[in-house]
Amino acid sequence: MPSPFVLLEVDTPSGPREVKVTNPEKTYFSGLAAGQGRKIDLVEYYRSVAQGVVRGLFERPTVLKRHPDGAEAEAIYQKRVPENRPGWIETATVRFPSGRHATELCPVDVAHVMWAANLGTLDFHPWPSRRSDTESPDELRVDLDPMPGTTWDDVRTVAGVVREALTDLGMSGFVKTSGSKGLHVYCRIEPRWTFTQVRRSALALGRDVAQRIPDLATAAWWKEERGERVFLDYNRMARDQTIASAYSVRARAAATVSAPLLWAELPDAEIEDFTIVTMPPRFAELGDVHAGIDESVSPLEPLLELVERQERDQGLGEAAYPPQFPKMEGEPLRSRPSVAGPAAEKRAAADARAAEADADRARTSPRPRRPTTGESKG
């Protein structure tokens, strides 16, 4: 028997689009009241914050984190856009650290977002670069990841120091909740720099913040060195490393979302304040509180100068990349400090090769298709 569906007409700058929503009554969020956590509610949520979510995704290659069986079920990270898609869906081609390529979704309007939500996409993970030049990021992202033993107050405090550090450098930061445990601070930059340069700048910023509040913040890559502190994850600026976009829904029973904030709101903000139920009325009242981000372009040169000063005055050079990356120029031994040595170097190299091979297989091996009605089981 064919799955039930509804057809939604969506206004876009290119004209009306029709988005098919299959199984609209399917429960996606068990922590919400009846009639609030269905698949149709997820899709309509994205329509309600259209201007904001599109601002964060516009012209960016985007990875889809799909939960076709609901928020508490298995996740699928989909880098390649499905072949079975409407003709109006736009795409972008990107290159991975392995040298392989993929064609990813490239949202240009809310119809793209709603179409992906019908596939079970909860959160959207865009590249920090645009389709016109995928090799040059136009966004510096600071990911504040709280380690066990830290509190939400700690995360907010660290975010405030990130803002201070950016201000000292003549840069403007925009803060949002992750929708999960942490906070993100975004800076628009000119697309003139490579991923290597922008990542290195993120590392320098993380180290600067950690030096200002060493008991609360760390930029140490190895978990054994982080302690009970907030980790500033500089590797989120490495190629093909992404984080959930503004207004993305997270895989939690309560359907929390990644909420853009005004800095004045941060001291009182809680992750649980922002859900697919509470965000639409907030958006209707305030609009997108990050509406000015595209016009607030910060210079990256002060951070690049900080990189040079840290190297010259403190001997702080490169730091480890994620395991799926090949050995990078200037990178130290990619092995935990507690097991460092010649044997560890060989193990680290072997682990990196294995991780890269696994990542390539994951990207190129198609997932077995679910029975569908032409769109999605989700």
Residue ranges and their predicted role:
Residues 64-67, 173-179, 220-224:
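Short beta-strand
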Residues 2-16, 35, 43, 47-148, ...:
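SsDNA-processing nucleotidyl-transfer enzymes
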Residues 164-172, 211-212:
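Secondary-structure boundary elements
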